[in-house]
From Swiss-Prot:
Its main location: plastid. PROSITE patterns: HEXOKINASE_1 (PS00378), HEXOKINASE_2 (PS51748). GO terms for molecular function: ATP binding; D-glucose binding; fructokinase activity; glucokinase activity. ADP binds at G114, T115, N116, T263, G450. Residues 45-496 form the Hexokinase domain. This is Hexokinase-4, chloroplastic. Belongs to the hexokinase family. D-glucose binds at T204, K205, N239, D240, N266, E294, E324. It catalyses: a D-hexose + ATP = a D-hexose 6-phosphate + ADP + H(+); D-fructose + ATP = D-fructose 6-phosphate + ADP + H(+); D-glucose + ATP = D-glucose 6-phosphate + ADP + H(+). Keywords: ATP-binding, Chloroplast, Glycolysis, Kinase, Nucleotide-binding, Plastid, Transferase, Transit peptide. Expressed in roots, leaves, flowers, immature seeds, endosperm and seed coat.
Length: 509
C-alpha cells in the first residue's frame, strides 16, 4: 500500500480493528489482565475525534478559498491606498525598469537573506546571446558577526565581495571607463525610498546586529566597499521575491507575479503606477512598478485550528505573520507535531509512555513530512524510521504510521490550498485593474522556494486550488512555473536594467 493509499484508509475503522483484536486477546486472560488491557485500549479511540475535527478544519473547501482570495484582494487595495491601512504593507519596490534582454555588459549581485550570503557575476550579451556566463560563491556568516555591530557585518560582506571581484577572469569584460555595478538582494524588512536606497526596519532570521535599524543599508554597504577599496556602485536594492520576478521575466515577458514558498513566503506582482493612491504625491510617469505584498502578514478569513493558535501564542511574534505560519515550510512540521502531542497525551498511539522528544518544539520539520508522504511501501517503513529517529518512537505501530501521514496530509493540504487562494487573490485584483489583461491572455506566476520545489503534494494542492477558484477557462491561461534561484540572477539583471550607463529606461510592460 502506498502512502497515498494509507491516508485514504478510514483511520477510525483501523482503530476499531485494533481495539477488537486487543479485546479478543484480553478475553483469554484473567479479569485483572483484561482490565489493564481495556484501560490501555480505551484512550486509543480518543484520537478519532481529534482527527475528524482536524480533517474538517483543514479541508479548505471552495467557499473558504473564495473568502480568502477575496480578502487578499481587498487587503491589497487597502495597502495600496495608505500605509498602515491594512495587514498587507504593499511596499513599492521603486523598480520602474525591468530587464528586457537588451542589456549588455558585466554586472554583479549580492544576495543577503540568511546565515550565508552569495555573490555572483554575470556577463550579458543582449538579445542574441542573453546570459553568456555566470559565476557565484557562497560565504557563511559567523554567529558573532550576525550578533555584532553594523560596521563589522558590512565589512565582512564587502571583504568577501572584494575577494570575489579579484578572481574575475578573462571571460568577463567590463567596458573601459565604467564602474562595476551591483544588484543587492536584501531580504529583510526595509522602508524603500528609491531603487537604490532603503531604511532597515528591523533584523529577522536570527540577525541581531546593533546600530543598523533606521539606517540606509545601501549606504552601509557603500561605506564598507570604500573601506575595502572596492570601486562598485549599488544600482538596485531588491528583496528576493522582486529578484525572482525580474529573473523569470528576463526569459518570459508574460511573467506578472512571483511567489516564494520556502522556509518563509512572500509574493510580488507588477502594478500600474496610476493605481497606487499612496504614491500619487510623487507624480510618477504612467507606467508600471513591482509591488512587494509582504503577504505573510495576511490573516483575514484563514481557517485556523487550536494548534495554530497555540503555536502563534508561543512564537516570538504572536499575532503576526499568520499566513506565513499557516503555509510556509518553517511552521508546517511544527503544526503536525502539536497535533501528535495532543494525540499522544490522550491515547497510547505511540505506546504507553509519552515520547520525550515529541515535546521539543520544531523537532519535526517539513522535510520530514515530505519524506513520510513519499513513502510508497506497504508497511510505511520510512515513516517508522522517521518516527524513531526524530521523535524517539521505537517500533511505531502501523496505525501510528498511518495516523501520522494523515495528520501531515491535512496540514499540507490546507497550506497548499491557502497558498493557491492567495495567488488567485493577487491575479483577480490585477484583472480588475486591467480589465482582461490577466485572464484574457497567457499570464505566468513564477515560483521559487524549497517547499514548492521539493514537496509534490503541496504543489499539487496549491495548483488544484487555483484551478477550482478560477474554473477551467481562466485557469488554462495561468501558467505556474518554477524558476530556480532566480533572486540572485534577478538582482544582477535589475542592476543592468537600472544601470547609470543604460541608454534609455524601458518600461515594464
Amino acid at each position: 500500500m502506498s502512502a497515498a493509499a494509507a491516508i485514504a484508509s478510514p483511520i477510525p475503522a483501523a482503530i476499531a480493528v485494533v481495539q477488537q483484536q486487543r479485546r479478543g486477546r484480553s478475553r483469554g486472560g484473567g479479569s485483572g489482565a483484561a482490565a489493564v488491557r481495556c484501560s490501555a485500549v480505551a484512550p486509543t479511540s480518543a484520537i478519532a475525534p481529534i482527527l475528524a475535527d482536524l480533517r474538517l478544519r483543514c479541508a479548505a473547501p471552495l467557499p473558504v478559498l473564495r473568502r480568502v482570495a477575496d480578502a487578499m484582494a481587498s487587503g491589497m487595495r487597502a495597502g495600496l491606498a495608505d500605509d498602515g491601512a491594512g495587514e498587507l504593507k504593499m511596499i513599492p519596490s521603486h523598480v520602474y525598469s525591468l530587464p528586457t534582454g537588451n542589456e549588455t555588459g558585466l554586472f554583479y549581485a549580492l544576495d543577503l537573506g540568511g546565515t550565508n550570503f552569495r555573490v555572483l557575476r554575470v556577463q550579458l550579451g543582449g538579445k542574441d546571446k542573453r546570459i553568456i556566463d555566470t559565476e557565484f560563491e557562497q560565504v557563511s556568516i559567523p554567529r558573532e558577526i550576525m550578533h555584532g555591530i553594523t560596521e563589522d557585518l558590512f565589512d565582512f560582506i564587502a571583504s568577501g565581495l572584494s575577494r570575489f571581484v579579484a578572481t574575475e577572469g578573462d571571460k568577463f569584460h567590463l567596458p573601459q571607463g565604467r564602474k562595476r555595478e551591483l544588484g543587492f538582494t536584501f531580504s529583510f524588512p526595509v522602508n524603500q525610498t528609491s531603487i537604490d536606497s532603503g531604511i532597515l526596519i528591523k533584523w529577522t532570521k536570527g540577525f541581531a546586529v546593533s546600530g543598523t535599524a533606521g539606517k540606509d543599508v545601501v549606504a552601509c554597504l557603500n561605506a564598507a566597499m570604500e573601506r575595502q577599496g572596492l570601486d562598485m556602485r549599488v544600482s538596485a536594492l531588491v528583496n528576493d521575491t522582486v529578484g525572482t520576478l525580474a529573473g523569470a521575466r528576463y526569459w518570459d515577458d508574460d511573467v506578472m507575479v512571483a511567489v516564494i514558498l520556502g522556509t518563509g513566503t512572500n509574493a510580488c506582482y507588477i502594478q500600474r503606477t496610476e493605481a497606487i493612491p499612496k504614491l500619487q504625491h510623487l507624480k510618477l510617469e504612467t507606467g508600471n512598478t513591482i509591488i512587494n505584498t509582504e503577504w505573510g502578514a495576511f490573516s483575514d478569513g484563514l481557517p485556523l485550528t487550536e494548534f495554530d493558535r497555540e503555536m502563534d501564542d508561543e512564537s516570538i511574534n504572536p499575532g503576526e505573520q499568520i499566513f506565513e505560519k499557516t503555509i510556509s515550510g518553517m511552521y508546517l512540521g511544527e503544526i503536525v507535531r502539536r497535533v501528535l502531542v495532543k494525540m499522544a497525551e490522550v491515547s497510547d498511539l505511540f505506546g504507553h509512555s509519552f515520547p520525550k522528544k515529541l515535546a521539543e518544539p520544531f523537532v519535526l520539520r517539513t522535510p520530514h513530512l515530505c519524506a513520510m508522504q513519499q513513502d510508497t511501501s506497504d508497511n510505511l517503513g520510512e515513516v517508522e524510521s522517521i518516527l524513531s529517529d526524530v521523535i524517539g518512537v521505537s517500533q511505531a505501530s502501523l496505525l501510528a504510521r498511518r495516523v501520522t501521514v494523515e495528520v501531515s496530509d491535512c496540514i499540507i493540504r490546507r497550506g497548499g490550498r491557502l497558498a493557491g487562494a492567495g495567488i488567485v487573490g493577487i491575479l483577480e485584483k490585477m484583472e480588475n485593474d486591467s480589465r482582461g489583461h490577466i485572464f484574457g491572455r497567457r499570464t505566468v506566476v513564477a515560483m521559487d522556494g524549497g517547499l514548492y520545489e521539493k514537496y509534490p503534494q503541496y504543489r499539487r494542492y496549491m495548483k488544484e486550488a487555483v484551478a477550482e477558484l478560477l474554473g477551467p477557462e481562466r485557469s488554462n491561461r495561468i501558467a505556474i512555473e518554477h524558476t530556480k534561484d532566480g533572486s540572485g540572477i534577478g538582482a544582477a539583471l535589475l542592476a543592468a536594467a537600472n544601470s547609470k550607463y543604460a541608454a534609455a529606461q524601458i518600461s515594464t510592460r
